A protein has these predicted regions:
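Peri-membrane helix termini and adjoining interfacial loops of integral membrane proteins
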Residues: 34-44, 119-130, 219-227, 266-275, ...
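Short helix-to-coil transition segments within interhelical loops
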Residues: 51, 163-193, 368
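Cytoplasmic membrane-interface regions of multi-pass membrane proteins
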Residues: 86, 167-173, 266-276, 363
């Protein structure tokens, strides 16, 4: 027992050191950079940024598109999770819905931008098939579509996981008590999920607020705070002090998010025992939810079909003949092969060390008898 306690303490110290070196120290240096000028401490950089042309507009744009995107993403994620847990649809269909819901998380966000362009642009695949462009892809519309696809997997995993721990017999009890459909839906499904739904919204909002890949490809003239930061740090004349100010502003929502998530934990419902009840047969319910899941799955897949179609076309959209020339060019380019191998190596290393860190943190917070303050530090 003593050995186990010693091992957990060692894991705790290693995690604290890792978080301090790679998270706390850079954050502190960033904060100091935003206040330190040639003559010492100053707030001039903050005044300069907030009074500058376009910053407040970009900040407002970021909040607007992030809030709307997060709301839509949580709604879609809820529907797809509901189909899996609260319908009697075939198991194969449920697995298909789950696979589609998590598919976008395996692609980088800048890929979503290209997928939107090649799908919904004036010469996009879907636009050409339907003969009409439904929305302007450069600006709010493109950002909304990209952000929603980007954040649906995270919101889905949170809601899907929580639904698995909701006692299904609450549905039976609510019906036995004579509650109406809406009352049962609130009591047995929505009420136990309130904390998770709010948490999913916060996570989706923060991911949208800080993402750069999607605005870089389809942002257009609709400037958001991520593109402002890029222009300050990697523009013609980098300004690290102003960039630090913008970075601090971007970090503030994450701090608020953490505080809100801590607050929302008190609304989570904990069951002494979870029991699973067979859902009643309801063809109308299953048909409606099945159609909803099918439509959502098709819309998500349509976004990514073009990624597999365009590389096999001679010259999209003018020469649509089949060719493998593009693949041959890529695989024969030694520099691209080196870049690909470097990316693969970094991804494997990140996955390995990230998994170890997450597992160690889970051991400390859920399976150790260390003091409460130790667990709070990790969380």
């Amino acid at each position: 027992m003593k050995r186990k306690s010693w091992e957990l303490k060692l894991i705790f110290l290693v995690l604290v050191a890792v978080f301090a070196i790679f998270l706390a120290v850079p954050a502190i240096r960033l904060l100091l950079k935003s206040f330190l000028g040639e003559d010492g401490l100053t707030g001039a950089y903050y005044l300069d940024v907030f009074s500058g042309k376009g910053f407040t507009t970009a900040l407002g744009n970021s909040f607007a598109v992030s809030i709307v995107s997060a709301l839509v993403a949580v709604g879609i994620a809820f529907v797809m999770a509901y189909i899996i847990h609260y319908t009697r649809l075939p198991r194969g269909f449920k697995r298909f819905v789950q696979a589609v819901a998590t598919l976008p998380m395996f692609l980088p966000t800048i890929t979503y931008g290209f997928a939107i362009i090649y799908s919904f642009g004036k010469q996009g695949l879907i636009t050409r098939l339907l003969g009409h462009q439904f929305f302007d892809i450069y600006g709010f519309g493109g950002l909304l579509v990209g952000y929603v696809i980007y954040t649906v997997p995270v919101a889905f995993l949170l809601i899907h996981n929580t639904m698995g721990y909701v006692d299904k017999k609450t549905l039976v009890v609510s019906k036995a008590m004579g509650d109406g459909t809406l009352s049962t839906f609130w009591i047995a499904i929505l009420r136990p999920l309130l904390g998770t739904l709010a948490g999913a919204f916060i996570q989706a909002f923060f991911l949208c607020f800080t993402d750069f890949g999607i605005p870089a490809s389809v942002g257009g003239d609709y400037e958001v705070i991520a593109t402002v930061l890029y222009n300050e740090m990697l523009g013609g004349v980098p300004d690290f002090n102003r960039g630090a100010v913008i970075s601090v502003v971007m970090l503030l929502p994450s701090i608020v998010s953490i505080l809100l998530l801590r607050f929302l934990e008190r609304y989570n419902i904990r069951y002494d025992r979870i029991s699973d009840a067979d859902l009643r047969r309801n063809p109308g319910r299953d048909t409606a939810w099945g159609l909803s899941g099918t439509v959502l799955a098709i819309l998500i897949l349509c976004m990514f079909v073009v990624i597999f179609v365009v590389p096999l076309v001679e010259r999209w959209p003018y020469q649509t003949g089949f060719t493998l020339e593009h693949f041959q060019e890529v695989f024969s380019d030694n520099e691209l092969q080196t870049v690909y191998l470097n990316s693969l190596g970094m991804a494997l290393a990140t996955a390995l060390f990230g998994t170890l860190a997450a597992y160690g943190a889970a051991l400390i917070t859920a399976r150790s008898k260390l003091p409460g303050w130790c667990k709070q530090v990790i969380v």
